Amino acid sequence: SDPKIGNGCFGFPIDRIGSVSGLGCNRLVQNPPKPISGES
């Protein structure tokens, strides 16, 4: 629901699109590949 989710990917605030679309951009912002790679 936060604009920051989509803002990191498309460059403009995305409210529902970022979450509903699930393009993965929102996930990358919240969970960058660095920590994921280390934990895995």
Swiss-Prot record:
Disulfide partners: C9-C25
InterPro entries the record matches: Natr_peptide, Natr_peptide_CS, Natriuretic_peptide_brain
Record keywords, A-Z: Disulfide bond, Hypotensive agent, Secreted, Toxin, Vasoactive, Vasodilator
Residue ranges that the Swiss-Prot or TrEMBL entry lists as coiled coil: none
Gene Ontology BP terms: regulation of blood pressure; vasodilation
GO CC entries: extracellular region
Keyword presence, Nucleus: no
One Pfam family in the UniProt entry: ANP
Main location (coarse class): secreted
GO molecular function: hormone activity; toxin activity
Subcellular location: Secreted
Tissue expression as described in the entry: Expressed by the venom gland.
Signal peptide: none
Function noted in UniProt: Snake venom natriuretic peptide that targets both NPR1 and NPR2. Exhibits hypotensive and vasodepressor activities.
Assigned protein family: Belongs to the natriuretic peptide family.
Protein name as catalogued: Natriuretic peptide PaNP-a
Organism: Pseudechis australis (Mulga snake)
